[in-house]
């Protein structure tokens, strides 16, 4: 590099800069004066114009008007024209308004009010110079006015109370929390500089915390914080501005510091040594309570203790369970102690916490042992089997009474075999073993057969009971016999595919038919070889699995999938729900049809349980002809259908693998169906019962029931008597037709009147009435006389010993009559429907073949009805006198009283020509006399009503009084008295001079007879003598009458 040239260039540059800064731009102009001929040179110098005067600062909170003008602006344009000055901005034309004003001519700016720096730290005034036309002569100028700060705001903490926490035993100078405070005065100024100071500490034993003067950080002063001494500290902190000066402003806050617990206390047991005692061979769940003391925070992991064994519990006889709520340990005995083996134990216990110890005391912890002395008390012990289970081996060469070994109980106190016990077999499958009660020698009862081998699955497991009668104690030992290597031969196949064992017992197949072998698998596969004579070699060899999936199986699978593809096509061709007459279709099922199949799956009524109980296939006891018994009387069933469980009452052990059922609660052998002799099924016996019914017995039973019903139906006579039907809906109000009015005559049910007596029973069943049995044609029926015995007057009769029938309300009852003639048949006239419905009606029906009708029948009934008097269907022989004018009807002043006379048939003798009935104006008593039949001779009787029956609502009907010859009877009917005027109605003898009269207190006559020209009056009445005498009292429900 050429340093001389570089230095020369730098010097020249510096010289030009200095020259430019310190020199003025001047222009000299020559002025020639023509008067005196002289020349003057004027020097013109360019100067920067003075446009503003810098504004003075304003102090907040003071009157700054003494400093006016705080600024002055001026434009050079004012030299040659008029200039107007204007200002704008915050404090002028923006809030706060009117703080600054300007003199438009001189440009002086004045302040007019007190300012607040915290509200407006500074003002920006926009100045403009305008000409007379309002145009800017200069570019607008910004004038800044600064507001000086004063210390008028104290420090403010962000929270009134600060909360912090720190662990005990923390190191010195550990940060606890940081306080935050602010000052609204000017930042980075002494007025806003805050200094912090701790002015108070609670508890005030010794200062534990320090605070940073400038940052507000609170730290620990030392490492002596101890939660067990003080769990919380409270500090009062002051913050002062002006760096804590005396002239500064200050504020205070609270600081709460929680001391957290650490595991710095070693737990220890309340008692250093303890002594206890316990009897041998006993267990105790609360042998000793051990309390642990720990000074750490309760219910925390630092406080919860764990007690452990240091020594003395090598046999695991004891356990310790801790209570976390009380920190108390419970010493338990979980394994019996033996006095003969040890009579004293020394336990050494240690304790620690669940949580690890704090590092501050880790080096100080030393394990301290607590001694527990346990004394074992001696007791008189019984005998026990040692060992608890014993195994023997039995082969096919061992025969009956073969001694396979002995299993004796051991006397623990004497340490020798017990001599005071007796032995019995407990659980003994297939009754295989026997034991000597004194010597405990175990022998075989019989030679082990192949059936027993299969039942046991190759392994026998039973129990032996050792009973000490003196001490009343029993112990149990288990016997296990391995039969796998006993040398039993396998089965060989027969010609028909079944297998025959070496002992000649045939079983259907190659399975064990319901009995598991060892692990519970019920199927055993045999490999059967043949010798030169075609007989199996008897080698027991499981077959190897050589089954594989060949082409034929694949073809069958493909064919199955193809058949499934035809299902949619078949469904399309199926005529499901077709139109009527178009082939098979869905049959409509009526609603509310219960059908004849009942819940017990037998058509018709439920059969007698005692009869059907014999139809099930009985289970036969187990004998040697089919299966050897394998359960003794100590076995108890514990399940139903399909479980494989059996319990032993003596030893409390349970053995699985037996297929037992709860069908008959049998103990001593499995259930065997007679249809499967000699076999035992693998599954539950429920399939055997449900699938193996004795069909011959069931067929015979149902045939006998069908024949009995047929014979009973044929033995009943034809029912050809006059039937009375109540037309349903009679007396309905006129407006009750409703929406069914358009049906018209389609619902005419008059054809039911000609159906005959065959449909009476169907009608009774439909109405829910009790169907009366038809009389048998056998003259011996009924077996005894049922002639009614009428009670004396003033009492209420009972019907046939049956309890009284409670009245029902809100229903309509149809009264049907049945009379069985002994002579020629009766012509059936067309019945006339009653214009009135029956309500609150009591009907007394009587049948007799000879003798005189008992005159005294008294009925007390409190039912109510309308004011109706009905004399209805009085029937006598055809030779009666003219009935015209017989009855007279009074003037019905009360419209509610209705008198109806209907179907009166005259007998051979004349009836009285008049029927006098007084005016029943205030009476509501209704008396109906109905169908009194007398073929030849007269009936002398009367129907009287007590005169006290006025204003009552009792309806009494005397119905179907049938007489063969010379019946004289009366029926006296009494109702509850109601008060008012009333009377009685007396019924005289009808037919031979009988008549009907009444004295109810008035006089009125009926001079005409309704329906005298009915066609059935001329019909000849045959003998209507029934075959028996019956009496019935029926109470009917309430029906409204048409008045």
From Swiss-Prot:
Residues of this chain annotated as glycosylated in UniProt: 110, 180, 496
GO MF term list: calcium ion binding; gamma-catenin binding
Disulfide pairings: none
Residue numbers spanned by region Disordered: 770-807
Gene3D superfamilies referenced in this protein's UniProt entry, alphabetically: Cadherins, TCF3-CBD (Catenin binding domain)
Subcellular location: Cell membrane; Cell junction, Desmosome; Cytoplasm; Nucleus
Domain Cadherin, first and last residues per copy: 50-158, 159-270, 271-385, 386-498
Main location: membrane
Matching PROSITE patterns: CADHERIN_1, CADHERIN_2
GO CC, alphabetical: cytoplasm; desmosome; nucleus; plasma membrane
Signal peptide residue numbers: 1-23
One annotated GO biological process: cell-cell adhesion
Cytoplasmic side: 573-1043
The Desmoglein repeat repeat ranges on this chain: 819-845, 846-875, 876-905, 906-933, 934-962
Keyword terms of this UniProt record: Calcium, Cell adhesion, Cell junction, Cell membrane, Cleavage on pair of basic residues, Cytoplasm, Glycoprotein, Membrane, Metal-binding, Nucleus, Repeat, Signal, Transmembrane, Transmembrane helix
Comment text on domains: Three calcium ions are usually bound at the interface of each cadherin domain and rigidify the connections, imparting a strong curvature to the full-length ectodomain.
Entry function: Component of intercellular desmosome junctions. Involved in the interaction of plaque proteins and intermediate filaments mediating cell-cell adhesion.
Oligomeric and partner information: Binds to JUP/plakoglobin. Interacts with PKP2. Interacts with DSC3; there is evidence to suggest that the interaction promotes cell-cell adhesion of keratinocytes.
Protein known as: Desmoglein-1
Gene name in the database record: DSG1
